[in-house]
Amino acid sequence: MADLLNYRKEDSDMNYNINEQKLGFDRVLPWEGQVPALVKEGEHYFLQVKAPEAEKVTFTMNEEEFPCTREDDGIWRMEYTLRTGIQYVQLKIDDVEVVTPLLPITYGYSRPYNYVALEMKNEEFYQVKDVPHGSVRREYFFSKVTEEWESCIVYTPYCYEEETEREFPVLYLQHGHGENEIGWTASGKVNFILDNLIAEKKAVPMVIVMSNG
C-alpha cells in the first residue's frame, strides 16, 4: 500500500493529458497489488503487469506478439521500444485478451482496445497546449433512416458559443474498419490537433461530426 500511496503523476515523466480515456481525464492509478502498466526508467519505457499466477504474458503491437519476462515478484515486463507517439497495444495473459484500465482505452479491431501515448518532441501537433480549446460533446438523435436512436460526437471550436451568427464549416469524419466514433477523440486526439491548428492559423475554426458507421 505504501508504494501505491507514494505513486505520483510527476514520477512517471509522461504527459497525462494525452492519456485521457473514458474512465477519467487523469490516468487510472494502480490498485493495491498491481503496478503501473507503463513506466519510464531513464530513457527506456517498459510495459508491465503483475500476474504471479500466469504462465505466459505478451503484448501485441502492429499485429506482432512480444513476450514478457517474468520477474521474481510476479511482475511480467517487456521494454517498449516503439517511438511512435500513439500505438495500439493488446495485453494477453495465458493467451486471453485483457483490456487493462491502467492504459488508456480506445476502440479498435472491433472491440475495446488499449493504446500507449507518449509525449514525442517531433509529434507535438496532438499535444494539449496552452491555446484556446474547443468543446467535445455527445449528441443524441432519432434517425428516420435506421428508425433507432443514434449518437454522434461533435467538436465545436472555442469561438462557437460566442459567434452565434457565424456559419462554421462542418467536417464529417468517418472511422475506418473495426473502429467507432470514440477513436477520433480518444486515441486520435482530433480535438487537440484542431485546437492547435486553429491557434497557429493553419486551419479555420470548424465543427467536426463523428458518428459510428
Residues covered by each model-derived region:
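Non-catalytic cap/lid and distal C-terminal segments of serine-dependent acyl enzymes
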Residues: D3-L29, G33-F66, R70-G213
